[in-house]
Regions:
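MIDAS-like acidic motif and immediate structural context at the N-terminus
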Residues: 1-24
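Structural beta-sheet core signal
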Residues: 8, 38-40, 100, 129-131
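DG-centered beta-turn motif at the end of beta-strands
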Residues: 10-13, 95-108, 150
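Metal-dependent catalytic core segments for phosphate chemistry
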Residues: 18-75
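A short acidic, amphipathic alpha-helical/loop segment
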Residues: 22-26, 112-119, 141
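Von Willebrand factor
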Residues: 51, 58-96, 134-140
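Von Willebrand factor type A / integrin I
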Residues: 117-169
Length: 169
């Protein structure tokens, strides 16, 4: 039996400001308990796993420093492409789980998110999309990418996380 390799991609764009702190705390718990790798993105992708491993109360400030100057907008497809082609290329496989924590608003061309998530799925990874609103993300990019995502789950509180626990394997 082989444990699933968990990758968490956290949207830290302006539209996610009010949710990013919760998402990063949850991601940190999975780094510490499940050896997850965590990446943050808005216009670019950056791995923050080493920062989340540190015992520091200033993690949010350090992550803000890492992402400073990324610019406006959210480039989810570009970030997913960087994730699967550079950062996790050798580690993605059938036992991989990729969690995207985002509202789904993407400044890239709408069809590109479908293509990039398709590349992740093509490696055998299962994709779960966690979003902060009661309904599924409705952007054009998300509508096109629906077939690539195994499940959509609301994540706006620890209660939501507890309710999602049974499907997170």
């Amino acid at each position: 039996f082989r444990l699933a390799r968990l990758f968490i991609l956290v949207d830290v764009s302006r539209s996610m400001e009010t949710h990013a702190q919760l998402f990063l705390r949850i991601a940190r718990a999975f780094v510490q308990a499940a050896n997850a790798r965590v990446f943050v993105f808005h216009t670019r992708l950056a791995e923050v796993t080493p920062l989340l491993l540190r015992d520091s109360k200033n993690v949010q400030e350090k992550i803000n420093a890492v992402t400073a100057g990324f610019g406006g907008g959210t480039r989810i497809a570009t970030s997913v492409a960087d994730f699967h082609s550079v950062h996790a290329r050798a580690q993605l496989g059938r036992s991989s789980r990729v969690w995207v924590l985002s509202d789904g608003f993407d400044a890239d061309e709408p069809q590109r998110l479908n293509e990039e998530l398709g590349a992740v799925r093509g490696r055998g990874a299962r994709i779960s999309w966690f979003h902060p609103s009661p309904q599924r993300p409705a952007s054009e990019a998300m509508q096109l990418a629906l077939p690539r995502v195994s499940r959509f789950l609301r994540l706006n509180s620890l209660r939501d996380l507890a309710e999602a626990a049974e499907v997170l394997n």
